[in-house]
A protein has these predicted regions:
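Conserved catalytic core of the tyrosine transesterase superfamily
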Residues: 1-169
C-alpha cells in the first residue's frame, strides 16, 4: 500500500507579531491619574504596574499588600508554576502605590485582614476578568478606543525594553 498523505506538505502558518503600544501611546495613558478617587487611582496603578514590571494579569490579581516593600518598591510575585520572583517598581509607580495604599487602607468597609492589593468597590479582591474590564473602561475614559488587554501591556513592556537594547531572556 502507498501512503499518499506522505506526499502532502502542510501549509505554513503565518507568524504574527504580538500587539503592543508605542511609547508615545503609553505616555498618554500614564500621563497622570484621571482623579484622586479610589477607583481612578487604582486603575492608573494597574497600568503603572503592568507596564513597568511586565507582570501577567494573573500575577497582578494575586498581589498581596503583605508582600510589598514600599521603601524600595519591591514586589514579591507568585507566577506560573507557583514560583516566586521579585520585581521592582519605578519611581512613578512607587509614588502612586503609596497614594493608593493610603486610600485603600482608609476605606470604612475594608476588612483589615484583606491582604489583596487591588480591591473592587465592594472591597473584595479584583478578579482577572475584573482587571481586564477595568483596563478597557479606563482607556475608554481616556478616549482611547483600541482593544487593549493587560497582555498587550506585557508585550509593550518587552518591546520597549528590546528597543532600548535590553536582553529580555
Amino acid at each position: 500500500k502507498t501512503n499518499w498523505a506522505s506526499y502532502l506538505t502542510s501549509p505554513k502558518l503565518e507568524k504574527h507579531l504580538p500587539k503592543f503600544l508605542f511609547e508615545s501611546e503609553m505616555q498618554v495613558i500614564l500621563a497622570e491619574p484621571l482623579s484622586d478617587s479610589f477607583s481612578d487611582l487604582r486603575d492608573y496603578l494597574i497600568f503603572e504596574i503592568l507596564y513597568c514590571t511586565g507582570l501577567r494579569v494573573s500575577e497582578l490579581a494575586s498581589l498581596k499588600v503583605s508582600l510589598i516593600r514600599e521603601s524600595d518598591g519591591k514586589l514579591v510575585v507568585r507566577g506560573k508554576g507557583n514560583k516566586e520572583r521579585v520585581v521592582f517598581l519605578g519611581e512613578s509607580a512607587k509614588k502612586c502605590l503609596q497614594r493608593y495604599l493610603v486610600l485603600r487602607n482608609s476605606r470604612n468597609k475594608l476588612d483589615k485582614s484583606e491582604d489583596a492589593l487591588f480591591l473592587s468597590q465592594r472591597d473584595q479582591q479584583l478578579s482577572i476578568r475584573g482587571i481586564q474590564y477595568l483596563v478597557s473602561s479606563y482607556l475608554d475614559k481616556l478616549g482611547i478606543y483600541k482593544h487593549i488587554s493587560p497582555h498587550v501591556l506585557r508585550h509593550s513592556f518587552a518591546t520597549h525594553l528590546l528597543n532600548s537594547g535590553a536582553d529580555i531572556r
